[in-house]
Amino acid sequence: MLDTSIQELINKWQQYLILQKNYSHHTVVSYNNDLKHFLEFMHYYNSDLVTINHIKTADIRLIRSWLAKRNCNNFTTSSISRGLSAVKNFYKFLEKTTQLNSHIIFSIKSPKKTKLLPKSLSEDDVVISLKHIEEYGNVKWVELRNKALLVLIYATGLRISEALSITKLHLQNLEFIRIIGKGSKERIIPWLPIVKNLITQYLEILPYKLGENEPIFRGKQGKKLQPTVFNRELIKLKRFYGLPEHLTAHSFRHSFASHLLEHGADLRSIQELLGHKSLSTTQNYTKTSIKHLVSVYTSAYPIKK
């Protein structure tokens, strides 16, 4: 399949990756396998022994055909991207060792990685989580903080970063919360009584005085609570109660959307609540629009008590 001179080049390339580029053994093995697949495809494509000339003259059609074949064989986007990176790396090595000049392969972009949505939790898993999250914290105000924060995320669909940025100013409106999310997109989310009640209870026993513009969720030392700290609490929860491995703060945001959809909320309203579509400013948001959003939300939301 391969001309002996090609195998010698591959061996030198592997040594280069290990000794000069300091690549891990795992990476070198993966790259070698990807290059091997590429050269096997080249052999099949040309119906001939693969020589250095075949490698030099490989055109864009051959390379794209190889990528397409990998896609048809159900390789993940990450695997396809890594394969292309491996072959590009080999070609770069050939350039470096004066085996060839600039090649067409460097103009081919890696496929965009598919962004997988986090899996949602069942309503039973959510109920268990909300019921038992208070068991972690060791201090009453921390326990109440954990519950208030988790209920807030599940009841509003906020990103963890958005939830941890909530201040006392956000609590002044009794009907809804106004959030400026990613890309400066504004959205309006109705308050559920259970959320405001829990936050109020938490603030009443919080041992730190806060200004109106300071985030209300604090760590044990009084500083702004960090996402990693809260997710550690969730790890304890899911391990003790045998909850799904994908349970994280963000999975409650996804569950918020999934459960609303299951309970009859329309997709447009859910997109608005999640901040996936731009909304007008609050001033341009008519009272009718707000009332409609509140109506859809409160009638569909699984936890309304």
Curated annotation (Swiss-Prot):
Residues 116-298 form the Tyr recombinase domain. One of its GO terms (biological process) is cell division. The keyword Cytoplasm applies. Keywords: Cell cycle, Cell division, Chromosome partition, Cytoplasm, DNA integration, DNA recombination, DNA-binding. SUPFAM superfamilies: DNA breaking-rejoining enzymes. Disulfide bonds: none annotated. InterPro entries: CB (IPR044068), DNA_brk_join_enz (IPR011010), Integrase-like_cat_sf (IPR013762), Integrase_catalytic (IPR002104), Integrase_recombinase_N (IPR010998), Integrase_SAM-like_N (IPR004107), Tyrosine_recombinase_XerC/XerD (IPR023009), Tyrosine_recombinase_XerCD (IPR050090). One of its GO terms (molecular function) is tyrosine-based site-specific recombinase activity. The active site is at R159, K182, H250, R253, H276, Y285. One of its GO terms (cellular component) is cytoplasm. Its main location: cytoplasm. Residues 4-95 form the Core-binding (CB) domain. It is found in: Cytoplasm. Site-specific tyrosine recombinase, which acts by catalyzing the cutting and rejoining of the recombining DNA molecules. The XerC-XerD complex is essential to convert dimers of the bacterial chromosome into monomers to permit their segregation at cell division. It also contributes to the segregational stability of plasmids. Forms a cyclic heterotetrameric complex composed of two molecules of XerC and two molecules of XerD. Belongs to the 'phage' integrase family. XerC subfamily. This is Tyrosine recombinase XerC. It comes from Rickettsia canadensis (strain McKiel).
